[in-house]
Amino acid sequence: MKKAIGMLVLSSLLAACGGGGGTDKIGEASTVFNMLGKNDRIEIHAFDDPQIKGVTCYISYAKKGGLKETVNLEEDASDASVSCVQTAPQITFNETEVAKPQKIFKKGSSFIFKTLQVMRYYDPARKVFSYMVYSDKVIQGSPKNSMDAFSCYTGAPLDAAKVSVQPNQQIHGSCIVTLAQK
C-alpha cells in the first residue's frame, strides 16, 4: 500500500514539473468522453520564440484523458501541429544566435519516455524560419510531424527612415537582423 501511495505522489510531482513551460493555454476541444477523469482532447497553446522578438508560435496536440491522466500514466498520441506568426510591428533577432537549429518547446507526452518538441531552423539566404513539431521516445520516435515557415517578408515592410538601426544591423522586410561582428 505504501508503495502505491509513493508512486502516486511521485507521478503527481512529475506531472506538476512537466508540461510546456512558458506557454499560454488558448483553448481545447473535447474528442472522446471519459466517465472517469478528463475527456480526451486537443489542446492549443501559444508561446513566444525566446530568441526572436515579435514571433509567437501556436501548437495544437492530442491529449489523452481518463483515469490514467489523473495519475500521469497516459501516453499522448504523436499528432500535433504548429503555426508561427508575427505578433509585433517589427521582428528582431541576432543572426548568429539563431543560425543553428534549436529546440524552443518541449513537453512530456507520457510518464517518462515520450516528449513533444518544436525545433526552429533558420535559412539565412532567404531570411526564413522553419518550425517543426514532432514527438520522440527513448527507444523509437514517430515520423509524424508538422511544420510551418515564417519569412521576414511576410509582414508589412519597415520604413527605414522611421526605424533606428545600429551599424551591425540590417532591415529585411519586417525584420531587424543583427549581423555577426567581423
Describe the role of every protein-language-model region:
Residues A15-A16:
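C-terminal motif of bacterial Sec signal peptides marking the signal peptidase cleavage site
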Residues T56-A125:
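Mature extracytoplasmic domains of secretory-pathway proteins
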Residues K2-L8:
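Sec-dependent signal peptide recognition
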Residues G22-S83:
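N-terminal secretory signal peptides
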Residues L10-S11, P50-Q51, A77, N145, ...:
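Residue-level signal for mature regions of secreted extracellular proteins and peptides
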Residues G19-G20, I59, Q86, T154, ...:
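Disulfide-rich extracellular modules and peptides
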Residues R126-K182:
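C-terminal partner/receptor-binding element of secreted or periplasmic proteins
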